[in-house]
C-alpha cells in the first residue's frame, strides 16, 4: 500500500469512487489540491483531511501576489431572455437553450466584440456541442481561424483536444469553442482571452473556466474576459 497519496482536483474526493480508494490504501499522509473546495451539494471536502488546511490562497490574493495575471471583464449585452427558457433539475433545458443562443444576431454581437481586441489565443465556452459547432462555423465563415472541441460525436468543425491546443499555441488557431472538456486538467498559459457564451449556473464551474486563462506566460500581462 502507498503511505503517501496526493490527489489533484480534490473537490471530487467526496465521491464514493474516491472514498473507496482512500479507504483501501489508508495512507499515512493524504494531500489534497484544489482551486474550488466548495461544492454545490454541500458535501464537506475538508472533512477528508480532518479540517487540516496546510495552505489556502484565494483568487484575489493569488493575483495580488503575482502568481496569476489580472483580468479585465467586459460585459456584453444581448436580448436573450433566460426567464422563458425551461429548467430541468436546476439547469436550462439544452434544446431550448440552443434555440435561444444559436442565432446569427447573437453570433454577430460576439464576433463584433471579439474583433475589438487584439487577443489571438481565445477559449470560448459554449452551452452544448451544437452551440460550439454553430459558433465555430460562424467564426470560420468570417475568416477567423477556429475549431470546436468537445466529447461525443464529432461535427464538421471538431478537432482533437491536443491537436487544437497545439494549433492555438503555434498560431494556426485563434479560437477554440468548447463546452466543459477544458474545465479541468488543461494547462495552456498562452490563453489570453476567455469568452463566456453560455449561462453558467455553478460558481465553481465559472471559476474553473475563468482559471483557464489566468496562468502567467511570456508577453502576457492580463486576461481579457468577454
Can you annotate each of these PLM segments?
Residues 7-14, 39-40, 185, 203, ...:
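Catalytic P-loop NTPase motifs of RecA-like helicase/translocase cores
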Residues 1:
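Inter-Walker segment of RecA-like/P-loop motor cores
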Residues 66, 176-194, 211-215:
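SF2 helicase motor core recognition
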Amino acid at each position: 500500500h502507498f503511505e503517501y497519496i496526493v490527489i489533484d482536483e480534490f473537490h471530487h474526493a467526496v465521491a464514493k469512487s474516491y472514498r473507496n480508494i482512500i479507504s483501501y490504501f489508508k495512507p499515512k499522509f493524504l494531500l489534497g489540491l484544489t482551486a474550488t473546495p466548495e461544492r454545490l451539494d454541500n458535501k464537506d471536502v475538508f472533512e477528508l483531511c480532518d479540517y487540516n488546511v496546510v495552505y489556502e490562497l484565494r483568487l484575489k490574493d493569488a493575483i495580488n501576489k503575482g502568481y496569476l495575471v489580472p483580468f479585465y471583464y467586459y460585459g456584453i449585452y444581448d436580448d436573450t431572455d433566460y426567464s422563458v427558457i425551461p429548467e430541468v433539475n436546476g439547469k436550462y433545458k439544452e434544446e431550448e437553450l440552443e434555440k435561444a443562443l444559436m442565432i446569427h444576431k447573437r453570433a454577430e454581437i460576439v464576433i463584433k466584440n471579439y474583433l475589438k481586441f487584439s487577443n489571438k489565443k481565445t477559449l470560448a465556452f459554449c452551452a452544448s456541442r451544437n452551440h460550439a459547432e454553430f459558433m465555430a462555423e460562424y467564426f470560420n465563415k468570417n475568416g477567423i481561424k477556429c475549431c470546436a472541441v468537445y466529447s461525443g460525436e464529432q461535427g464538421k468543425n471538431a478537432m482533437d483536444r491536443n491537436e487544437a491546443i497545439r494549433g492555438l499555441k503555434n498560431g494556426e488557431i485563434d479560437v477554440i469553442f468548447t463546452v466543459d472538456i477544458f474545465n479541468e486538467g488543461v494547462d495552456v498559459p498562452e490563453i489570453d482571452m476567455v469568452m463566456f457564451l453560455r449561462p453558467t449556473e455553478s460558481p465553481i464551474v465559472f471559476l474553473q473556466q475563468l482559471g483557464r486563462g489566468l496562468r502567467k506566460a511570456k508577453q502576457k500581462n492580463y486576461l481579457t474576459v468577454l
